[in-house]
Amino acid sequence: MTIGCMSAIGSNGSLLTAPDMRRRLRELQERGGKLVVIDPRRSETAHIADEHVAVVPGADAALLLAMVQVIVKAGLAQERWLEQHTRGFQEVAAAISDFTPERVAAVAGVPAEVIVRLAHEFASARSSVAYARIGICNNAYSTVASYAVDLLNAVAGRLGAAGGAVFPKPAIDLPRLSRLSGADGFARWKSRVRGLPETAGDVPASTLAEEMETVGTGQVRALVTFAGNPVLTVPNGQRLARALQKLDFMVSIDMYINETTRF
């Protein structure tokens, strides 16, 4: 089963993602599939897409939840699949009931009729997938937006399905390693400043700047980064950039000078 409809959110896949992605996207279109790019910017991928939806920056979550709301209201949700593989679907459906296309249109800058059409096309296609990259991870609602991508795939029954969002076997089975090492828990300890709970041994990266700035026992005074750019990828990157300059010691292992390694 090949993809019939692919919605790429905050992704410039033809240029920056998997090897030879531009060819793969072209083949998707040649098979009769539709490529929809949801991105404020007319990127290289948006330029070759069948449809470019220029959402207002930061409104990705609202747009995606509105699409889910349309699918649920229209009776297109794969409820049998959801009953077998998920918990809490009815609670989620109730929670997003106010995200109507009419209300979201003003926020997202996308006409209500377009939101409705996109939702119907996604849920009704023989196969479809919503795919997102770092573009949706750089705004105030990035966590909700990332969740909404999975939610959209789930209500349409596309998680783990042929032509949908598949789960390939990774080279390194990190979930299994987490279980074996005992690092797969939740809230066993909390961050020093705000008391945010850990998940699988980590706290949100958004705590990094405050842990550097706040004086006291356990204050972060040194940092090692490896092939990463937290100033760009962590929320409120400018605050983190200011905090990095006040560290006692910092090492960055990377091939490039970027927003983080320059410190």
Can you name each region flagged by the protein language model?
Residues M1-P170, R188, R192-F263:
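Cofactor-pocket helix-loop regions in the catalytic cores of large enzyme subunits
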Residues A49, S178-L180:
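Short aromatic-enriched loop/helix-cap "lid" or pocket-rim segments at secondary-structure transitions
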Residues S181-F186:
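Surface-exposed loop and adjacent secondary-structure segments within mature catalytic domains
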